[in-house]
């Protein structure tokens, strides 16, 4: 798909770099900071010594590894230390994790580079040059973030290099001890081994290794791996089973109080007045406080007040009893219907930003010679909540010129910044403890709850305060997955070949909102997430155009598991099925024709179809193929329909994610992604009426239950390619696979999410 690239795209890239460069003073003349050694020491205790910025070792041989990413079920507490253990030649059981300090070497470079608007097939100088420059910028920014299915991809080189360097230092120390050449020594199971049978434990060499000069540092080859590529048990499972795992809501600093909030029910509303006299007499109530002015702009948390009490139940009951009057503000008439109408109007009037162009779509749409049929369709997707099992929470203490924060956050860097700002201290005086996350899905990339908690704690006379949102607070004050509207048009010749493919969509921009509220950047320019999965797809057409119109609304939006792929995969894979039907071709055969130049994608599709076999009587198989975060996923959904009820019995999920670091975790993430995507496909919808979110809890924002969960079969294709993301790629293909199966069964094309047959003619 190497069509002509527009000058606008280059302006977008270079303009984006200019904005990013403006954040960094002199990044162009400062050598990039290496990722091996940082400026902040590792938080090691006892007799442990640091061998580099990532790795420390104790006298007993325990290896301490810095953990810069948040564990929210995706398995980083297992997969990332595997990289160090592999290169150090130590058992995984010998590794303990320590929270990475707020240092630039732990910044997520891969996530920022993945945000560039390049097609996977691009191999030109522009892509390589821009990627190189963005890498330099990313190193200087040092944003510590967990998201974008980037943890393994980003850590693959620096954490292996850290382990290999530590091993080389230990070998050098042993060579000095034995007065021999380091080249003749080898390592295994936490020991340096001499050819004559002598061995020294790493722990015994730790102190001397600190000053050792490593010789050649060589990373292992694929065939030398002993841990990587083999199933390893999850390190976090025992603590989750026995109850010792610490999530945000489990933080218990001495003297802790609790806080509950009352937030404006109308988006953008403010507090008019509060009468707290009666509430202050309620059992356990300590204080009623206002946190106005502390929140980032246009975030999930709404304006309001908080009640501080001696238990959460006391705080929540008092918050509900507060007599609060609200100023509804300018969004009191906002509705989902009005937002979709605005999308449609803008699509009618504006061309939007062209993310990809090939050939001449205008000529094809003008009924050029050979056009036998035109297919048009309009698709839509709703706002979605994150609905993580652990409710939004944060614990904070402001005392003696320091701010202590305990948070289940995906953005430690942003959390430190906002805690310092709201707490009135420097970032050096913020102590952040990142706990496990009971689900994140992108919601905890935002730090509105940290700002809120610190603002409340600042008024708690030095006591730590744990702020907890109820499920209703969470559902009605999320940063939602954007709603979207997409229009498709395609032309076919008499043989069913696609001559032209046009897609124009409309939605809000997550990036505009997110970077405004977290970095203060003014909104502007295109946003790759609005068109990802469309402009960079692997289907080839001689004439093609992918455009997007950004249409802002007052609804706060944020990153949601798989981001733009979550709806663009539904739009694209459903429309591809429509084209197969219009061409009179089998949907799988049609895709195979389109993937002739992409053997990896074709192999994934074939693997899923082969594993799925033939659908039983009364059921149908729907197919979808989508690439996101570097990973190719094909899914076959086995579906039945009874009346208007859609039932998904089985999903086969074939995956090419590059080298499979831990196949167990990959299979787990595939299963998780399928269930998460199925919840959105069948049930997920947040609607706005009179400026308020209408849904409040699982009774009206349901998720897939155990009796509704399909059997998930995962096929992991072998690969020696660089590891790619796995936390999100299994989510996007679910909805189109199910919708395509429903069409086979009923002849009804479902073009709106959530999927429903009610009222469909």
Segments (PLM) and residue ranges:
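Cofactor-binding beta-sheet edge motifs in enzyme active sites
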Residues: 2-761
């Amino acid at each position: 798909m190497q069509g002509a690239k527009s000058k606008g795209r280059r302006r977008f890239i270079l303009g984006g770099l200019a904005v990013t460069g403006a954040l960094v003073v002199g990044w162009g003349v400062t050598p990039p900071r290496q990722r091996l050694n940082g400026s902040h020491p590792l938080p090691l205790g006892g007799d442990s010594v640091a061998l580099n910025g990532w790795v420390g070792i104790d006298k007993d041989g325990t290896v301490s590894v810095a953990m810069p990413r948040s564990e929210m079920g995706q398995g980083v507490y297992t997969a990332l230390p595997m990289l160090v253990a592999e290169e150090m030649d130590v058992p995984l059981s010998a590794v303990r994790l320590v929270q990475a300090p707020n240092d630039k070497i732990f910044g997520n470079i891969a996530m920022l580079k993945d945000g560039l608007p390049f097609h996977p097939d691009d191999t030109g100088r522009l892509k390589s040059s821009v990627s190189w420059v963005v890498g330099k910028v990313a190193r200087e920014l040092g944003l510590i973030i967990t998201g974008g299915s980037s943890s393994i991809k980003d850590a693959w080189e620096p954490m292996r290099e850290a382990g290999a360097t530590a091993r080389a230092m230990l070998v050098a120390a042993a060579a000095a001890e034995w007065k021999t050449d380091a080249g003749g020594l080898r390592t295994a199971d936490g020991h340096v081994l001499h050819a004559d049978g002598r061995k020294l434990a790493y722990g015994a060499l730790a102190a001397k290794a600190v000053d050792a000069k490593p010789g050649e540092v060589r990373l292992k080859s694929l065939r030398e791996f002993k841990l990587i590529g083999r199933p390893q048990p999850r390190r976090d499972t025992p603590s989750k089973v026995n109850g010792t795992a610490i999530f945000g809501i489990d933080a218990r600093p001495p003297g802790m109080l609790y806080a509950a909030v009352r937030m404006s029910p109308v988006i953008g509303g403010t507090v008019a007045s509060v009468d707290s006299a009666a509430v202050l007499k309620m059992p356990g109530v300590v204080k009623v406080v206002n946190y106005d002015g502390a929140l980032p702009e246009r975030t999930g948390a709404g304006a309001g007040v908080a009640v501080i009490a001696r238990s959460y139940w006391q705080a929540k009951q008092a918050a509900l009893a507060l007599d609060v009057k609200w100023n509804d503000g300018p969004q009191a008439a906002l509705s989902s219907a009005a937002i979709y109408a605005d999308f449609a109007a803008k699509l009618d009037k504006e061309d939007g930003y062209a993310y990809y162009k090939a050939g001449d779509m205008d000529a094809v749409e003008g009924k050029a010679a050979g056009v036998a049929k035109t297919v048009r369709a309009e698709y839509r997707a709703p706002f979605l909540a994150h609905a993580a099992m652990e409710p939004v929470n944060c614990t904070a203490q402001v005392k003696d010129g320091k701010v202590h924060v305990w948070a289940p956050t995906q953005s430690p860097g942003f959390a430190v910044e906002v805690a310092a700002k709201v707490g009135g201290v420097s970032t050096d005086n913020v102590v952040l403890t990142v706990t496990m996350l009971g689900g994140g899905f992108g919601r905890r990339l935002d730090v509105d709850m940290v700002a809120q908690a610190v603002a409340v704690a600042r008024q708690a006379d030095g006591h730590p305060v744990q702020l907890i949102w109820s499920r209703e607070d969470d559902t009605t004050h999320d940063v939602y997955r954007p709603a979207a509207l997409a229009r498709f048009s395609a032309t076919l010749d008499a043989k069913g070949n696609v001559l032209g493919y046009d897609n124009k969509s409309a939605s809000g921009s997550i990036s505009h909102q997110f970077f405004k509220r977290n970095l203060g950047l003014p909104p502007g320019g295109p946003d790759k997430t609005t068109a990802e999965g469309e402009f960079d797809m692997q289907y080839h057409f001689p004439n093609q155009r992918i455009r997007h119109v950004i249409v802002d609304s007052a609804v706060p939006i944020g990153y949601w598991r798989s981001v733009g792929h979550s709806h663009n995969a539904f739009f694209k894979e459903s429309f591809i099925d429509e084209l197969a039907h219009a061409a009179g071709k089998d949907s799988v055969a049609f895709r195979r024709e389109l993937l002739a130049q992409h053997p990896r994608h074709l192999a994934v599709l074939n693997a899923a179809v082969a594993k799925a076999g033939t659908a039983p009587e009364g059921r149908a198989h729907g197919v979808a193929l989508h690439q996101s975060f570097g990973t190719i996923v094909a899914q076959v959904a086995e579906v039945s329909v009874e009346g208007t009820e859609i039932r998904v019995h089985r999903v086969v999920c074939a995956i090419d994610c590059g080298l499979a670091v831990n196949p167990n975790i990959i299979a787990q993430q595939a299963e998780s992604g399928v269930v998460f995507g199925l919840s959105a496909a069948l049930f997920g919808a947040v609607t706005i009426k009179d400026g308020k979110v209408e849904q409040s809890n699982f009774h009206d924002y349901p998720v897939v239950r155990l009796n509704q969960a399909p059997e998930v079969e995962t096929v992991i294709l072998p690969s020696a390619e660089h590891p790619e993301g796995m936390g999100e790629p299994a989510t996007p293909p679910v909805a189109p696979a199910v919708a395509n199966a429903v069409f086979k069964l009923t002849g009804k094309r479902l073009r709106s999410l959530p999927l429903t047959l009610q009222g469909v003619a």
